[in-house]
Amino acid sequence: MAKVSVVSLHKESRRTESNKYKGYPFLANGEKNDYPTMIELLVGGSATAKACAGVIADFIYGKGFSLEAEARATARQQRTRFRKDTLYINDKRETPNDLLKKVARSLSYHRGVFVQVNYNQLFQKTSVQVLPYRYCRLGARDSNNYRGKVLYYENWDNLQDKKEVDKNVKAIDLYDPSPKVIQEQVDAAGGWDNYKGQVYFLNLDRNDSYPLAWADVVLLDCESEMLSTKYTRNGFKKGFFGTYAFVTSTMNSDEDREDFRDNLRNSIGVEAEQSVFHFELEMKGDKLEDQVLVKPIESNVKADLFEYADKKTANNIRKTYGNIPPVLIDFVEGKLGNTSGDSLKEARIFMQEQMQEERQDVQEMFEELFDNFAEPISSNGLFEIMTNY
């Protein structure tokens, strides 16, 4: 797993790397070019951030595209089986709804998504699929101030030998459906068999580089919540919280000392090793309690302070995700209790309005991507996302 660290926001930079892969310099994403991976690790490790990302994805996806629901309804009315294969949009047997789920998830973590489009020799689109966000980097601008490439590589966080990277990096053209442009790209690639299609990049920040994630300003809070969970887990796993001192009489030899410490490790488990200290003292008495003493070392982490910090951290995270109402996070985590149906409904309506712009961006992207598709998916060219209210 890649090793990442939280970055100071004032030091965060988007820069063009001097290294060229496939002949193209690229725009690094983050101070160490590991920003997307860092986001996925920290959001995935924070219960609140992960729940918030799930809420964002749900309200972008809604109930899916109306065209797919209508096709299913028509099949039911005709008392025939719904032929899902009529909506397949790539060789992964995905439908527009399947693609929408992946788009929503990428946007819920990164506020951006990369989508690959392939063409046939009639310049019709033949397949559309989402690329993993963390594998994609924008190419640098050329002498004409044009950014024409996306570099695709599956291990940006662990760059190896430059020649090895260069061999595995894929340079894919940015989206431009003009037949003239496509033909020029095909010729440059050495023919249709070598052509990799194009990549559409939806950036919710609408800037000239990469968007900042929803969790960007609360990365430290995400890390704190992740560490809090780990602290609690380790406490239960090893059977006690805090740090302890084991005091014994002086060992007769190094061998006796190592045997004692090995037995101690085996009894408390590897997870607790760093929470136990062994001290040797001249102790009097023949009884066991006179020879071995176990003393807790007082921790400055108080339960009430711990609870306050956890709540404050969770609230900070929630606010950065469009100020998601707490009731929706409780719903995701199964903690609704006596929450009224009205408050849940109001919260859903609020989030539906909050995500209206994002859904509109996604609808327009789909309408663009499936324009001139070889097998028409939408009879009127529209891709309307159904909402809950």
Task: Give the positions of each predicted feature.
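Short coil/turn segments at secondary-structure boundaries
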Residues: 115-119, 239, 328-334, 380-384
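Generic structural signal for hydrophobic core residues of well-folded globular domains
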Residues: 103, 107, 249, 320-321, ...
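Structured, contiguous alpha/beta core segments that scaffold functional sites
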Residues: 2-50, 54, 58-64, 80-284
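Hydrophobic/aromatic-lined pockets within catalytic cores
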Residues: 47, 56, 60-61, 70, ...
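Extended, non-catalytic structural segments that build the interaction scaffolds
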Residues: 30-47, 247-256, 285-316, 338-358, ...
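Alpha-helical oligomerization segments
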Residues: 347, 353-355, 360, 364-387
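Long amphipathic alpha-helical segments
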Residues: 146-166, 170-173, 256-339, 364-377
